[in-house]
Amino acid sequence: DRENTSFMESQNMQSGDAYSVVYTKDASFGMSICYDVRFPKMYQKMTEAGAEILVVVANFTKPTGKAHWQTLLQARAIENACFVIAVDQVGTKTELGFDAYGHTMVIDPWGRVLASIEEDKEACLMVDLDLSLISKVRTQIPILKNEREELEVHAFHE
């Protein structure tokens, strides 16, 4: 285990210039990768564009994954009242110099983990999603409707 390593995604990847929402006859999917999970506004914009399921494809290191992976994913599900399907690579990434975390999971709009795979295991998940839960949660907790982006910040200094 290489517990003290990190991976600078920006050294190997180039950022995109738009968010992607894919519409199918069954559902709409907001697509994202790895480091994107740290940007809540991105997921809010995809949700406002109609995403019902937020997909995160990642390659988190073990230390970062253990500390942040599930918490970030549950936050994105709750903030947007969406399902989250998050897949993370497993095993040693010799060429990148770190061990990947794994722990693929599916989370519902309440933030409940519906299914997951242990952090060092390779497996497949099959989960039936009840998309009607999205509207139920959004009715009970209308976060997206109650957002007040017009408010200003007033800073007070000593």
Task: Identify what each model region corresponds to.
Residues D1-M8, G102, I107, H157:
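Proteins with a high burden of low-complexity, intrinsically disordered sequence enriched in S/T/G/P/A and R
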Residues S28, R38-C124:
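CN hydrolase (nitrilase-like) catalytic-core segments centered on the catalytic cysteine
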Residues S132-E158:
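A short C-terminal boundary segment appended to hydrolase-like catalytic domains
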Residues D120-E122, D130-L133:
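A short, acidic, flexible beta-alpha connecting loop/helix-capping segment that sits on the rim
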Residues D1-A49, K62-T71, Q140-I143, V153:
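Active-site catalytic loop in hydrolytic enzyme cores
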Residues D26, Y35, W110, D130-L131:
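A broadly conserved detector of short glycine/acidic/proline-rich loop/turn motifs that flank catalytic sites
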